[in-house]
Amino acid sequence: MTFPDTTSSAAPQATAHAKINLFLHITGRRDDGYHLLDSLAVFAGAADRVTLTAPSNTMSLTIDGPFGQGLEADDQNLVLRAARALQAQAGTTIGGLTESFHLELQKNLPVSSGIGGGSADSAATLRLLAREWNVDQAALFPIAETLGADVPVCVAQRPTRMQGIGEILAPAPVLPDAGLLLVNPGVGVSTPDVFRAFAAGGGIVERPEPFLPDRWNTAQDMVADLNATTNDLQAPALSQCPVIGTVLASIESLPGCLLSRMSGSGATCFGIFSSPESAVAAAHVLNAQSARLGWWTWAGGFHHTGAST
């Protein structure tokens, strides 16, 4: 393989878009402790980026970007774990793949924030190396399942209904050209602590499985259906991180907001608006109101195009 100069924009790269849970229902728990879920996962334009910069004697990683500080580029990093898992699998199935590379992770998304950052980075690494090694994308999903519950849906990187522990993926409704605002208060939330609070608060609620249409024509149509759903982890996360309530109230008060909700196990929250332009305008208002708080915000549209980018 010929690698371009590391300063060239032609260096092989893949984007790791933020995953948003428009709803998240906890439906059961397996004997091994893993929770079962039913969730509608979509992706925002906001993204990390993984780049292959040069051949290397071993898989290696550097991390930069606004949220790169404090992240370890060690063997436990999901980017390196994904690279080595695919290297081992591909070397077995298509023969003799022993190339190693230096990878760069540009970390633009907050960490431990409920938007699948580490999982998305892992999935982007799988897609990137699969392209370089001519590995079929379908072969990535069994590897993704070993790396984390959110990694398979991030490999697909398109609107998807997730069930099971995240390994059962089904088509989602076609999304409207709605606007999306993401807000993170700069506070990390422990997912295990949130699940413990969920269990302490009463745990699983029996409910009918939400009906999802084939398509939503407008943001208003989408929100009408989402209003019949919830995020079961929102209240437990609030008990662990009360500022989430402040964020949700701030989003809900913005002009044009149709729905405010927390994503995943928090602490990132989102607002849905009628158009990307409305979301951007609302973000300007919120940034002026919260400038001293240091909140991270992003506004724009949904990422629709799937895993190839």
UniProtKB/Swiss-Prot annotation:
Pathway(s) it belongs to: Isoprenoid biosynthesis; isopentenyl diphosphate biosynthesis via DXP pathway; isopentenyl diphosphate from 1-deoxy-D-xylulose 5-phosphate: step 3/6
Pfam family, one: GHMP_kinases_C
GO biological process: isopentenyl diphosphate biosynthetic process, methylerythritol 4-phosphate pathway; terpenoid biosynthetic process
Residues that bind ATP: P110, V111, S112, S113, G114, I115, G116, G117, G118, S119, A120
Matches recorded under HAMAP family: IspE
Keywords for the protein's UniProt record, in alphabetical order: ATP-binding, Isoprene biosynthesis, Kinase, Nucleotide-binding, Transferase
EC number annotated for this UniProt entry: 2.7.1.148
Lineage: Bacteria, Pseudomonadati, Pseudomonadota, Alphaproteobacteria, Acetobacterales
Family: Belongs to the GHMP kinase family. IspE subfamily.
Entry protein name: 4-diphosphocytidyl-2-C-methyl-D-erythritol kinase
UniProt cross-references to Gene3D superfamilies, sorted A to Z: 3.30.230.10, GHMP kinase, C-terminal domain
Cited PANTHER family: 4-DIPHOSPHOCYTIDYL-2-C-METHYL-D-ERYTHRITOL KINASE, CHLOROPLASTIC
Residue numbers annotated as active site: K19, D150
The protein's role, per its UniProt record: Catalyzes the phosphorylation of the position 2 hydroxy group of 4-diphosphocytidyl-2C-methyl-D-erythritol.
Reactions performed catalytically: 4-CDP-2-C-methyl-D-erythritol + ATP = 4-CDP-2-C-methyl-D-erythritol 2-phosphate + ADP + H(+)
Signal peptide: none
Molecular function GO terms recorded: 4-(cytidine 5'-diphospho)-2-C-methyl-D-erythritol kinase activity; ATP binding
Organism annotation: Gluconobacter oxydans (strain 621H)
